[in-house]
Amino acid sequence: MPRRLGSKDVIRVLEEHGFSFVTQRGSHAKYKNAAGRIAIVPHPKKELPIGTTRSIVRQSGLTPQDFGF
């Protein structure tokens, strides 16, 4: 079972892989990379549900190993 990550951990991984903050609406922040991929991260949240983390991994195009799974 993958470990649960907080939104700060997810944001750190995204920024390390070239994503930058674009905008925020309510509690959801939008991050975008140079290739145009967009990932939406609910913020602030101590622990994200596993399904939400998997969705962010898919949106970003990164591998689960990049997030420490």
How would you describe each model-predicted region?
Residues 1-24, 28-69:
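Basic nucleic-acid-binding interfaces
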